[in-house]
C-alpha cells in the first residue's frame, strides 16, 4: 500500500539533497522565491493611470 508519509519524507529528503548540492540555505530560499514571485507578477500589478483617465463612468438606468 502507498504511504503518503513515506512519500512526503522522500520528497523532503530530495529537496534537502538539492539544496545542499546548490548550497541554498533555507533562509535564502525565502528571499529567492519572493523575488521570483515579484518579477512574475510585476506586469500584473503595474498601474496604468493614463488608460483609466480615458474611461467614462457607466450610467445606470433604474426601472
Curated annotation (Swiss-Prot):
This protein's GO CC annotations: host cell endoplasmic reticulum membrane; host cell Golgi membrane; membrane
Keyword Cytoplasm: no
Entry's localization field: Host endoplasmic reticulum membrane; Host Golgi apparatus membrane; Host cytoplasm
Keyword Cytoplasm: no
Keyword tags: Host cytoplasm, Host endoplasmic reticulum, Host Golgi apparatus, Host membrane, Host-virus interaction, Inhibition of host innate immune response by virus, Inhibition of host interferon signaling pathway by virus, Inhibition of host STAT1 by virus, Interferon antiviral system evasion, Membrane, Viral immunoevasion, Virulence
Annotated spans, Critical for disrupting nuclear import: 54-63
Biological process annotations from GO: symbiont-mediated suppression of host innate immune response; symbiont-mediated suppression of host JAK-STAT cascade via inhibition of STAT1 activity; symbiont-mediated suppression of host type I interferon-mediated signaling pathway
Family: Belongs to the coronaviruses accessory protein 6 family.
Summary of subunit composition and partner proteins: May interact with nsp8. Interacts with protein ORF9b. Interacts with host RAE1 in NUP98-RAE1 complex; the interaction disrupts the host nuclear import. Interacts with host KPNA2.
Role of this protein: Disrupts bidirectional nucleocytoplasmic transport by interacting with host RAE1-NUP98 complex. Disrupts cell nuclear import complex formation also by tethering karyopherin alpha 2 and karyopherin beta 1 to the membrane. Retention of import factors at the ER/Golgi membrane leads to a loss of transport into the nucleus. Thereby prevents STAT1 nuclear translocation in response to interferon signaling, thus blocking the expression of interferon stimulated genes (ISGs) that display multiple antiviral activities.
Protein name as annotated: ORF6 protein
